[in-house]
Each structure stands twice: as structure tokens, then as C-alpha cells.
Design a protein with these regions (language model features):
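Class I SAM-dependent methyltransferase Rossmann-like catalytic core
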Residues: 1-35, 47
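Conserved S-adenosyl-L-methionine
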Residues: 44
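Glycine-rich SAM-binding Motif I of class I
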Residues: 48-52
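Class I SAM-dependent methyltransferase SAM/SAH-binding core
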Residues: 54-119
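Short conserved loop adjoining the S-adenosyl-L-methionine
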Residues: 119-125
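A conserved beta-strand element that flanks and buttresses the S-adenosyl-L-methionine
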Residues: 132
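A short, conserved alpha-helix within the catalytic core of class I
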Residues: 139-152
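Conserved class I S-adenosyl-L-methionine
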Residues: 160-173
Length: 173
């Protein structure tokens, strides 16, 4: 996978937010309602935009693993999530490398993991209910995608993918 700068991710984030399918976000919201606590692995997390986009629509207790090969982007994610939490009146603290963002009805735990995902997700033995992959699948091989779906199946995890482009255009009059 290619590296991206935080500046580039900043430029595309408003368009990415607008491009997310609201019906899929609604389905995630409904699905997450079955869980008291949802455990999410965000692959290719970048600056954490997927968390910021869908976490408010999910259950009140969530644990996120933001996984990216770039420690620089993960550092940016921590900074941006702190600002995001402040804007939502969530208190923020760090306990043993686990970031906590807590509000009246929300409780988010976030761990930042620097991993090279070139061969697929690395299993750390953590419980995973949902895997998110945003703007990544168009950068990886068919084999990588097959490994991802196999990993999700083995974990019993749901898979949310978005913002992927296959390079094809279709026009109709």
C-alpha cells in the first residue's frame, strides 16, 4: 500500500464524508445495537476519519483499534480524535496506551497500532466484532481481499468497506 500524507487526507475528508452511503451507516447503527460493547478494527486507519464518521452512529460503548503502517498518521489520528472529542464534550484521557473518550452516553476506547498490512491483517488475538476498511481496497490485490474476508470470517466479524474505486467510469446519456 502506498503512503499518504495527513495533508492529502485532510483535503479528501470532506468529500469522503459526503460520499459515505447513509444507508450503510444506518445498517451499521442497527447492527451495533445488538452489542453492549462493539470492538472495531480499522485497517488503514490513517488519521482516524472512519471512526469520526461512523462511531457517533453506533452503540454507546466502543473499542477501536486504529491500524496503519504510518506512525506519523496515527499520531495525527490521536491529535484529531482529541479535538473531535472536545467538540463533542467528551472527556479524554490516556491509560496504559489506551485513549479514552467518555461522555454522558458515549464511551470510546482507542488503541493506535502501527502495522504493515501488506499481507493482510495481523491477528493479535483481540476480539473483533467489526472490521472497517475505508479507501483501501482499491490499493490492494485480490489475494489481500481474499485474506481479509477469510480473516473476518474466522473472527466472526462484520466487514464495512467504503470509498473504494475500481478505476472504471460508466456514463449514460
Amino acid at each position: 500500500m502506498n503512503g499518504f500524507s495527513a495533508a492529502w487526507l485532510d483535503l479528501r475528508e470532506p468529500a469522503d464524508v459526503a460520499a459515505r452511503a447513509p444507508e450503510l451507516v444506518k445498517k451499521i447503527s442497527e447492527w451495533s445495537g445488538r452489542y453492549e460493547h462493539v470492538n472495531v478494527a480499522d485497517l488503514g486507519a490513517g488519521t482516524g476519519s472512519c471512526l469520526r464518521a461512523i462511531a457517533p452512529h453506533m452503540g454507546s460503548r466502543q473499542s477501536w483499534r486504529l491500524i496503519d503502517r504510518s506512525g506519523v498518521l496515527l499520531d495525527e489520528a490521536a491529535e484529531r480524535l482529541s479535538k473531535w472529542a472536545y467538540q463533542r464534550s467528551l472527556s479524554a484521557r490516556v491509560e496504559q496506551n489506551i485513549w479514552r473518550f467518555i461522555g454522558k452516553i458515549s464511551d470510546y476506547s482507542v488503541v493506535f497500532e502501527e502495522q504493515d498490512l501488506a499481507t493482510g491483517p495481523v491477528d493479535t488475538g483481540s476480539v473483533v466484532d467489526l472490521v472497517t476498511v475505508s479507501a483501501v481496497l482499491d490499493l490492494v490485490s485480490k489475494e489481500w481481499c481474499t485474506n481479509l474476508t477469510r480473516w473476518c470470517s474466522e473472527k466472526g466479524a462484520a466487514l464495512y468497506t467504503c470509498l473504494n474505486y475500481d478505476g472504471q467510469f460508466h456514463f449514460t446519456p
